[in-house]
Amino acid sequence: MFKEGNAERLAARFEYVKNNMIEAKWLTEAEAAKMKVPTIAPRSTSGQLSGPKGHIIEAVQKELAKLGFVQDQLLVGGLVIKTTLDQKAQQAAVDAVNKFYPSKAPDDLRIGLVAIRPGTGEILALYGGRDYLERQLNDATQSITQAGSTFKSFALVAALEQGIPLSSMWNGDSPQTFDDAGKPYVVSNYGNNGFGQVNLLEATKRSINTIFVPLGIKVGPTNVVDVARRAGIPESVAMMPTPSVVLGTSSPHVIDVANAYATFAAQGIKSKPFLVTQVLGSNKGVLYEATPQTEEAFSREVMADLTYALKGTITGGTGAAALALGRPVAGKTGTSQSNASAWFSAYTPQIAASVAFFRDNATQSLNGIGGMTSLTGGSFPARIWTEFMKKALKGEPIMDFPAPANIGGLEPIVMTSGGVQKPKE
């Protein structure tokens, strides 16, 4: 797509290609003399595809194609396409991003948001970028970025499935060194903070790396990956069964993580996300009717304990910004290595949503954006999530989660991390 200020470069490139074609004898001098630089029309900045809605239109078209509707059918017109999008929620997503978009942000800052109805897979809101005409890549469904600590929830589920209780005690000192296939793997907490002996509830609340890595080793990295897959992270997202998998070194799409957390909100029922709910022909006959595709991925007991732990992230941990919602919330912040991405994935019983911040270059940090020394999942992403949910849930009843099942009991069982503590420098 033509970008303002590139006219001279485009003209030079035109002449360069033309001269090369003459040298290759694909054009004669006479033919080339008749060829003039084409007039470049200004880029369209308005119309049906402008703004965030262009990403939704393209996403709907892609889903229709997967459902078997060919381009000719869509171009002829006359079809009535109904989607799962909730008008109030969709506008809330756009408004929330606009309200908390960091001032003086770099041009390549990307924000994706997806909200899903737990238990059905209906996509209620989707924000894929500020302007489709500026950039066609959908930051909610196509862009990828490291998931950070949002993946710790998968290790917690694997632990609960193996009977490891939330009351179990672990060493939260920092840094520690663990074994990774015979090689030393040094793990530090955010800010290199040490926490001493704490239970899994506190480890979740504080997002303690030096506890979740040995937890993942204890339950088996393969099982952590298996939980992620069952929750909704697709096979297309590469996940290596190594100790680092619990720290979210994999790079999913925002919709993938939103769907996984929707599984948690639905008490273990995984659904396939979808946008198109019905297609009517020109005669109003039903050409397609969506049916939610669901399956039981986890037990209610495991989900009850997971949610209980993730509530602590909100009530006294890294996701405290969501307290402003004034409803029961469970969720997890996520900040990847070197602050290359920042996430907030959380849910109420009615809606699960994920918000992610990242840049085009995965090696570039978010630090400094919005005047923050360190942009984390608990900052802008959590604020956007909370603002979105306030409007999306307006008028909806306040609902709570099931009570914890207390898998494995309430005794503070001391677990051996297997890590070797390194002296702080």
Protein language model features and the residues they cover:
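Primarily short, surface-exposed interaction patches in extracytoplasmic proteins
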Residues: 133, 219-257, 285-288
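Conserved catalytic neighborhood of penicillin-recognizing serine enzymes
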Residues: 48-52, 164-224, 270, 281-312, ...
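Glycine-rich, acidic and aromatic/proline-enriched surface loops and short helix-turn segments
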Residues: 1, 59-66, 115-130, 160-164, ...
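Acidic/histidine-enriched alpha-helical segments
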Residues: 8-12, 23-42, 110-116, 171-176, ...
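Second-shell loop/turn segments in exported
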Residues: 1-8, 17-18, 22, 42-51, ...
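Extracytoplasmic/secreted proteins, especially bacterial periplasmic and envelope-associated proteins
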Residues: 5, 9-22, 51, 55, ...
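Non-catalytic, structured segments within soluble enzyme domains
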Residues: 1-84, 91, 226-230, 235-238, ...
